[in-house]
Protein backbone atom coordinates (compact mmCIF):
# COMPACT_ATOMS: atom_id res chain seq x y z
CA UNK A 1 0.00 0.00 0.00
CA UNK A 2 1.52 3.30 -1.14
CA UNK A 3 0.01 6.73 -1.36
CA UNK A 4 0.68 8.71 -4.52
CA UNK A 5 3.51 11.25 -4.53
CA UNK A 6 1.60 14.44 -3.81
CA UNK A 7 3.37 17.11 -1.72
CA UNK A 8 0.07 18.99 -1.24
CA UNK A 9 -1.35 16.02 0.72
CA UNK A 10 1.81 15.47 2.81
CA UNK A 11 0.43 16.94 6.05
CA UNK A 12 -2.71 14.76 5.85
CA UNK A 13 -0.67 11.62 5.25
CA UNK A 14 1.65 12.44 8.17
CA UNK A 15 -1.34 13.05 10.48
CA UNK A 16 -2.65 9.58 9.60
CA UNK A 17 0.69 8.01 10.59
CA UNK A 18 0.76 9.90 13.89
CA UNK A 19 -2.79 8.68 14.62
CA UNK A 20 -1.73 5.10 13.82
CA UNK A 21 1.29 5.27 16.14
CA UNK A 22 -0.82 6.81 18.94
CA UNK A 23 -3.34 3.99 18.55
CA UNK A 24 -0.65 1.26 18.67
CA UNK A 25 1.05 2.73 21.76
CA UNK A 26 -2.12 3.79 23.64
CA UNK A 27 -2.44 0.46 25.56
CA UNK A 28 0.96 1.17 27.15
CA UNK A 29 0.16 4.68 28.42
CA UNK A 30 2.58 6.31 25.97
CA UNK A 31 3.09 10.08 26.09
CA UNK A 32 2.30 12.18 23.00
CA UNK A 33 4.88 11.32 20.28
CA UNK A 34 7.36 13.92 19.07
CA UNK A 35 6.90 14.17 15.29
CA UNK A 36 9.79 14.68 12.86
CA UNK A 37 8.68 15.43 9.32
CA UNK A 38 10.49 14.93 6.03
CA UNK A 39 11.33 17.26 3.17
CA UNK A 40 8.37 17.00 0.77
CA UNK A 41 10.53 16.03 -2.22
CA UNK A 42 14.16 15.17 -3.10
CA UNK A 43 14.54 13.43 0.27
CA UNK A 44 15.68 10.00 -0.85
CA UNK A 45 19.46 9.67 -1.07
CA UNK A 46 19.52 6.33 -2.86
CA UNK A 47 17.59 4.86 -5.77
CA UNK A 48 17.74 1.71 -7.87
CA UNK A 49 16.35 1.40 -11.39
CA UNK A 50 15.95 -1.51 -13.78
CA UNK A 51 16.53 -0.69 -17.43
CA UNK A 52 13.89 -1.43 -20.05
CA UNK A 53 14.39 -1.63 -23.81
CA UNK A 54 11.91 0.24 -25.96
CA UNK A 55 12.34 1.77 -29.45
CA UNK A 56 15.86 0.30 -29.56
CA UNK A 57 16.92 2.29 -26.46
CA UNK A 58 17.36 1.52 -22.76
CA UNK A 59 15.25 3.60 -20.36
CA UNK A 60 15.01 3.91 -16.57
CA UNK A 61 12.09 1.79 -15.46
CA UNK A 62 10.10 1.02 -12.34
CA UNK A 63 7.42 -1.57 -11.76
CA UNK A 64 4.22 -1.58 -9.75
CA UNK A 65 4.18 -4.40 -7.14
CA UNK A 66 3.33 -7.71 -8.84
CA UNK A 67 3.59 -6.21 -12.36
CA UNK A 68 7.04 -7.46 -13.40
CA UNK A 69 6.33 -7.29 -17.12
CA UNK A 70 4.73 -3.86 -17.21
CA UNK A 71 7.42 -1.20 -17.00
CA UNK A 72 6.77 2.41 -16.07
CA UNK A 73 9.41 4.40 -17.98
CA UNK A 74 10.74 7.45 -16.17
CA UNK A 75 13.14 10.32 -16.86
CA UNK A 76 13.25 11.80 -13.39
CA UNK A 77 12.34 10.75 -9.86
CA UNK A 78 11.11 13.64 -7.66
CA UNK A 79 11.46 11.79 -4.36
CA UNK A 80 15.18 11.17 -5.06
CA UNK A 81 17.85 13.72 -4.18
CA UNK A 82 18.50 16.64 -6.51
CA UNK A 83 21.90 15.11 -7.24
CA UNK A 84 20.32 11.83 -8.43
CA UNK A 85 17.93 13.78 -10.64
CA UNK A 86 20.83 15.74 -12.12
CA UNK A 87 22.83 12.54 -12.76
CA UNK A 88 20.01 10.51 -14.34
CA UNK A 89 19.89 12.19 -17.79
CA UNK A 90 23.69 12.49 -17.99
CA UNK A 91 24.19 8.80 -17.23
CA UNK A 92 21.48 7.84 -19.73
CA UNK A 93 23.13 9.97 -22.44
CA UNK A 94 26.47 8.25 -21.67
CA UNK A 95 25.16 4.68 -22.03
CA UNK A 96 23.22 5.61 -25.17
CA UNK A 97 26.36 7.10 -26.75
CA UNK A 98 28.70 4.26 -25.75
CA UNK A 99 28.40 0.60 -26.75
CA UNK A 100 30.85 -0.29 -23.94
CA UNK A 101 28.74 1.36 -21.23
CA UNK A 102 25.33 0.39 -22.64
CA UNK A 103 25.85 -3.19 -23.83
CA UNK A 104 23.81 -5.57 -21.62
CA UNK A 105 23.44 -3.01 -18.84
CA UNK A 106 20.31 -4.04 -16.89
CA UNK A 107 20.32 -2.08 -13.62
CA UNK A 108 21.77 1.11 -12.12
CA UNK A 109 21.95 2.16 -8.47
CA UNK A 110 22.62 5.66 -7.19
CA UNK A 111 23.88 6.51 -3.70
CA UNK A 112 24.24 10.19 -2.77
CA UNK A 113 24.83 11.98 0.53
CA UNK A 114 23.91 15.29 2.17
CA UNK A 115 27.67 15.98 2.13
CA UNK A 116 27.63 16.03 -1.69
CA UNK A 117 29.23 12.66 -2.43
CA UNK A 118 27.84 10.30 -5.10
CA UNK A 119 28.39 6.75 -6.31
CA UNK A 120 26.80 4.91 -9.24
CA UNK A 121 26.70 1.11 -9.55
CA UNK A 122 26.13 -0.28 -13.06
CA UNK A 123 25.08 -3.96 -13.30
CA UNK A 124 25.68 -6.03 -16.45
CA UNK A 125 24.73 -9.39 -17.93
CA UNK A 126 28.24 -9.75 -19.41
CA UNK A 127 31.87 -9.80 -18.25
CA UNK A 128 33.52 -6.38 -17.90
CA UNK A 129 36.95 -5.75 -19.43
CA UNK A 130 39.58 -3.03 -19.80
CA UNK A 131 37.65 -1.30 -22.58
CA UNK A 132 34.71 -0.88 -20.19
CA UNK A 133 37.07 0.38 -17.49
CA UNK A 134 38.53 3.07 -19.79
CA UNK A 135 35.06 4.44 -20.61
CA UNK A 136 33.84 4.12 -17.02
CA UNK A 137 36.84 6.14 -15.84
CA UNK A 138 35.97 8.94 -18.28
CA UNK A 139 32.34 8.77 -17.12
CA UNK A 140 33.31 8.98 -13.44
CA UNK A 141 35.47 12.01 -14.13
CA UNK A 142 32.82 13.75 -16.24
CA UNK A 143 30.08 13.21 -13.62
CA UNK A 144 32.26 13.74 -10.53
CA UNK A 145 31.24 10.39 -9.01
CA UNK A 146 32.64 6.97 -8.17
CA UNK A 147 31.52 4.26 -10.60
CA UNK A 148 31.25 0.57 -9.78
CA UNK A 149 30.75 -2.05 -12.47
CA UNK A 150 29.18 -5.36 -11.48
CA UNK A 151 28.89 -8.52 -13.52
CA UNK A 152 28.53 -12.11 -12.37
CA UNK A 153 31.10 -12.69 -9.61
CA UNK A 154 33.11 -9.57 -10.48
CA UNK A 155 33.25 -5.97 -9.31
CA UNK A 156 35.33 -3.16 -10.83
CA UNK A 157 35.71 0.02 -8.77
CA UNK A 158 36.50 3.39 -10.33
CA UNK A 159 37.18 5.81 -7.47
CA UNK A 160 35.93 4.55 -4.10
CA UNK A 161 33.55 1.75 -3.18
CA UNK A 162 31.84 3.91 -0.55
CA UNK A 163 30.21 7.34 -0.29
CA UNK A 164 31.02 9.77 2.52
CA UNK A 165 28.21 11.28 4.59
CA UNK A 166 28.56 14.00 7.23
CA UNK A 167 25.81 14.46 9.84
CA UNK A 168 25.51 17.11 12.53
CA UNK A 169 24.35 15.88 15.94
CA UNK A 170 24.17 18.47 18.75
CA UNK A 171 26.79 20.64 17.05
CA UNK A 172 29.32 17.89 16.36
CA UNK A 173 29.78 16.69 12.79
CA UNK A 174 30.22 12.93 12.37
CA UNK A 175 31.68 11.46 9.18
CA UNK A 176 30.36 8.13 7.86
CA UNK A 177 31.57 5.77 5.17
CA UNK A 178 28.60 4.21 3.39
CA UNK A 179 29.84 1.11 1.52
CA UNK A 180 28.33 0.11 -1.81
CA UNK A 181 25.65 -2.53 -1.28
CA UNK A 182 25.41 -2.05 2.51
CA UNK A 183 22.31 -0.72 4.26
CA UNK A 184 22.11 3.04 4.85
CA UNK A 185 19.20 5.18 6.00
CA UNK A 186 17.65 6.46 2.75
CA UNK A 187 16.27 9.77 4.06
CA UNK A 188 19.31 11.74 5.23
CA UNK A 189 17.43 14.74 6.62
CA UNK A 190 15.19 12.53 8.77
CA UNK A 191 18.12 10.31 9.77
CA UNK A 192 19.85 13.40 11.18
CA UNK A 193 16.70 14.23 13.20
CA UNK A 194 16.53 10.62 14.40
CA UNK A 195 20.16 10.70 15.60
CA UNK A 196 19.52 13.96 17.44
CA UNK A 197 16.42 12.52 19.15
CA UNK A 198 18.31 9.37 20.24
CA UNK A 199 21.23 11.52 21.48
CA UNK A 200 18.81 13.65 23.51
CA UNK A 201 16.90 10.60 24.85
CA UNK A 202 20.14 8.94 25.94
CA UNK A 203 21.26 11.92 28.05
CA UNK A 204 24.70 12.10 29.68
CA UNK A 205 25.44 8.82 31.44
CA UNK A 206 28.22 7.52 33.64
CA UNK A 207 27.52 3.88 32.84
CA UNK A 208 27.79 1.74 29.68
CA UNK A 209 25.72 1.07 26.57
CA UNK A 210 25.02 -2.23 24.82
CA UNK A 211 24.02 -1.79 21.18
CA UNK A 212 22.45 -4.58 19.12
CA UNK A 213 22.41 -4.46 15.29
CA UNK A 214 24.80 -1.47 15.02
CA UNK A 215 25.15 -1.48 11.20
CA UNK A 216 27.78 0.98 9.96
CA UNK A 217 27.74 2.78 13.33
CA UNK A 218 24.98 5.25 12.38
CA UNK A 219 23.80 5.61 16.00
CA UNK A 220 26.97 4.26 17.64
CA UNK A 221 29.09 7.35 16.94
CA UNK A 222 26.88 10.01 18.58
CA UNK A 223 25.65 7.72 21.39
CA UNK A 224 29.23 6.75 22.32
CA UNK A 225 29.85 10.39 23.30
CA UNK A 226 27.08 10.09 25.94
CA UNK A 227 28.38 7.05 27.88
CA UNK A 228 31.52 5.58 29.45
CA UNK A 229 31.86 2.59 27.10
CA UNK A 230 29.89 0.88 24.33
CA UNK A 231 29.76 -2.80 23.40
CA UNK A 232 28.20 -3.02 19.93
CA UNK A 233 27.19 -6.13 17.97
CA UNK A 234 26.59 -6.65 14.25
CA UNK A 235 26.69 -9.77 12.06
CA UNK A 236 27.21 -8.29 8.57
CA UNK A 237 30.94 -8.26 7.76
CA UNK A 238 30.57 -5.26 5.39
CA UNK A 239 28.79 -3.26 8.08
CA UNK A 240 31.33 -4.24 10.75
CA UNK A 241 34.22 -3.06 8.54
CA UNK A 242 32.42 0.21 7.78
CA UNK A 243 31.66 0.74 11.49
CA UNK A 244 35.33 0.16 12.41
CA UNK A 245 36.43 2.71 9.76
CA UNK A 246 33.85 5.19 11.03
CA UNK A 247 34.94 4.84 14.66
CA UNK A 248 38.54 5.40 13.59
CA UNK A 249 37.73 8.33 11.29
CA UNK A 250 35.82 10.10 14.09
CA UNK A 251 38.37 9.28 16.80
CA UNK A 252 35.71 7.51 18.89
CA UNK A 253 37.75 5.15 21.07
CA UNK A 254 35.33 3.87 23.73
CA UNK A 255 33.54 1.30 21.53
CA UNK A 256 34.23 -2.43 21.22
CA UNK A 257 32.61 -4.08 18.23
CA UNK A 258 31.88 -7.82 18.07
CA UNK A 259 30.43 -10.01 15.33
CA UNK A 260 27.76 -11.81 17.33
CA UNK A 261 24.06 -12.30 16.76
CA UNK A 262 21.66 -11.17 19.50
CA UNK A 263 21.11 -14.85 20.34
CA UNK A 264 24.86 -15.50 20.72
CA UNK A 265 25.27 -12.40 22.85
CA UNK A 266 22.51 -13.64 25.17
CA UNK A 267 24.40 -16.93 25.55
CA UNK A 268 27.63 -15.04 26.27
CA UNK A 269 26.01 -12.78 28.90
CA UNK A 270 24.36 -15.81 30.52
CA UNK A 271 27.73 -17.63 30.43
CA UNK A 272 26.17 -20.53 28.51
CA UNK A 273 29.35 -20.89 26.46
CA UNK A 274 32.49 -18.89 25.63
CA UNK A 275 32.97 -17.25 22.21
CA UNK A 276 36.34 -16.84 20.53
CA UNK A 277 35.09 -13.59 19.02
CA UNK A 278 34.86 -12.18 22.58
CA UNK A 279 38.50 -12.92 23.37
CA UNK A 280 40.03 -10.02 25.25
CA UNK A 281 36.62 -8.60 26.21
CA UNK A 282 35.60 -8.93 29.86
CA UNK A 283 31.80 -8.74 29.83
CA UNK A 284 31.77 -8.50 33.64
CA UNK A 285 33.70 -5.20 33.48
CA UNK A 286 30.76 -3.45 31.80
CA UNK A 287 28.11 -1.63 33.80
CA UNK A 288 25.30 -1.56 31.26
CA UNK A 289 22.61 0.99 32.06
CA UNK A 290 21.03 1.16 28.60
CA UNK A 291 20.52 -1.20 25.69
CA UNK A 292 19.99 0.33 22.24
CA UNK A 293 18.18 -1.74 19.60
CA UNK A 294 17.38 -1.01 15.96
CA UNK A 295 16.10 -4.42 14.82
CA UNK A 296 14.96 -5.55 11.36
CA UNK A 297 11.25 -5.30 10.37
CA UNK A 298 10.41 -8.50 12.24
CA UNK A 299 11.31 -6.76 15.52
CA UNK A 300 13.11 -8.53 18.36
CA UNK A 301 12.55 -12.24 18.77
CA UNK A 302 11.18 -13.24 22.22
CA UNK A 303 14.64 -14.25 23.55
CA UNK A 304 16.24 -10.94 22.54
CA UNK A 305 13.28 -9.16 24.08
CA UNK A 306 13.94 -11.02 27.34
CA UNK A 307 17.62 -10.03 27.11
CA UNK A 308 16.67 -6.32 26.93
CA UNK A 309 14.44 -6.68 30.01
CA UNK A 310 17.47 -6.90 32.29
CA UNK A 311 18.47 -3.30 31.46
CA UNK A 312 17.28 -0.20 33.30
CA UNK A 313 16.64 1.61 30.01
CA UNK A 314 15.79 0.35 26.51
CA UNK A 315 16.22 2.79 23.63
CA UNK A 316 14.39 1.25 20.67
CA UNK A 317 14.31 2.51 17.06
CA UNK A 318 11.77 0.62 14.96
CA UNK A 319 10.96 0.45 11.25
CA UNK A 320 7.73 -1.46 11.94
CA UNK A 321 5.32 -0.08 14.58
CA UNK A 322 3.34 -3.35 14.73
CA UNK A 323 6.36 -5.40 15.86
CA UNK A 324 7.41 -2.52 18.15
CA UNK A 325 4.01 -2.72 19.87
CA UNK A 326 4.31 -6.52 20.17
CA UNK A 327 7.76 -6.16 21.79
CA UNK A 328 6.51 -3.48 24.21
CA UNK A 329 3.59 -5.76 25.15
CA UNK A 330 6.15 -8.39 26.19
CA UNK A 331 8.10 -5.83 28.27
CA UNK A 332 5.32 -3.69 29.75
CA UNK A 333 5.15 -5.49 33.10
CA UNK A 334 8.71 -4.31 33.87
CA UNK A 335 9.15 -1.20 31.67
CA UNK A 336 7.10 1.89 30.81
CA UNK A 337 7.37 4.28 27.85
CA UNK A 338 9.03 7.51 28.96
CA UNK A 339 9.19 9.15 25.53
CA UNK A 340 8.32 8.28 21.96
CA UNK A 341 8.72 9.75 18.49
CA UNK A 342 7.70 9.30 14.88
CA UNK A 343 10.27 9.87 12.12
CA UNK A 344 8.80 10.17 8.63
CA UNK A 345 11.60 8.38 6.75
CA UNK A 346 9.27 7.21 3.97
CA UNK A 347 6.76 9.88 2.92
CA UNK A 348 3.87 8.85 0.64
CA UNK A 349 4.01 5.24 1.90
CA UNK A 350 2.44 3.59 4.96
CA UNK A 351 5.93 2.83 6.36
CA UNK A 352 7.07 4.73 9.42
CA UNK A 353 10.12 4.79 11.64
CA UNK A 354 9.51 5.32 15.33
CA UNK A 355 11.49 5.50 18.55
CA UNK A 356 10.72 4.79 22.19
CA UNK A 357 12.65 5.11 25.42
CA UNK A 358 11.50 2.42 27.87
CA UNK A 359 12.46 2.82 31.52
CA UNK A 360 12.20 0.22 34.28
CA UNK A 361 9.12 0.72 36.48
Curated annotation (Swiss-Prot):
InterPro entries: MeTrfase_TrmA_AS, MeTrfase_TrmA_CS, SAM-dependent_MTases_sf, TrmA_MeTrfase, U5_MeTrfase_fam. Pfam families: tRNA_U5-meth_tr. GO terms for cellular component: cytosol. Signal peptide: none annotated. Keywords: Methyltransferase, S-adenosyl-L-methionine, Transferase, tRNA processing. It catalyses: uridine(54) in tRNA + S-adenosyl-L-methionine = 5-methyluridine(54) in tRNA + S-adenosyl-L-homocysteine + H(+); uridine(341) in tmRNA + S-adenosyl-L-methionine = 5-methyluridine(341) in tmRNA + S-adenosyl-L-homocysteine + H(+). Its EC number is 2.1.1.-, 2.1.1.35. One of its GO terms (molecular function) is tRNA (uracil(54)-C5)-methyltransferase activity, S-adenosyl methionine-dependent. It comes from the Bacteria. GO terms for biological process: tRNA methylation. S-adenosyl-L-methionine binds at residues 185, 213, 218, 234, 294. CDD domains: AdoMet_MTases. The active site is at 319 (nucleophile), 353 (proton acceptor). PANTHER family: TRNA/TMRNA (URACIL-C(5))-METHYLTRANSFERASE, TRNA_TMRNA (URACIL-C(5))-METHYLTRANSFERASE. Dual-specificity methyltransferase that catalyzes the formation of 5-methyluridine at position 54 (m5U54) in all tRNAs, and that of position 341 (m5U341) in tmRNA (transfer-mRNA). Belongs to the class I-like SAM-binding methyltransferase superfamily. RNA M5U methyltransferase family. TrmA subfamily. This is tRNA/tmRNA (uracil-C(5))-methyltransferase. It comes from Pseudomonas putida (strain ATCC 700007 / DSM 6899 / JCM 31910 / BCRC 17059 / LMG 24140 / F1). The lineage of its organism: Bacteria, Pseudomonadati, Pseudomonadota, Gammaproteobacteria, Pseudomonadales.
Amino acid sequence: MSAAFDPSSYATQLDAKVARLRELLAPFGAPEPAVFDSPREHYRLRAEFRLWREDGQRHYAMFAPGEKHKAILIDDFPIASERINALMPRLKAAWQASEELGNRLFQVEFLTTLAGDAMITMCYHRPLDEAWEVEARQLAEALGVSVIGRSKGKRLVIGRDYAVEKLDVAGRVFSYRQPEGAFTQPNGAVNQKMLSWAFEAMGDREDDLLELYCGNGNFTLPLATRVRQVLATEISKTSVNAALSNLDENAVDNVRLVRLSAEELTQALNEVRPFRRLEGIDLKSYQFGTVFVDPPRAGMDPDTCELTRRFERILYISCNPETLAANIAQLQDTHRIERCALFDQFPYTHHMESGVLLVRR
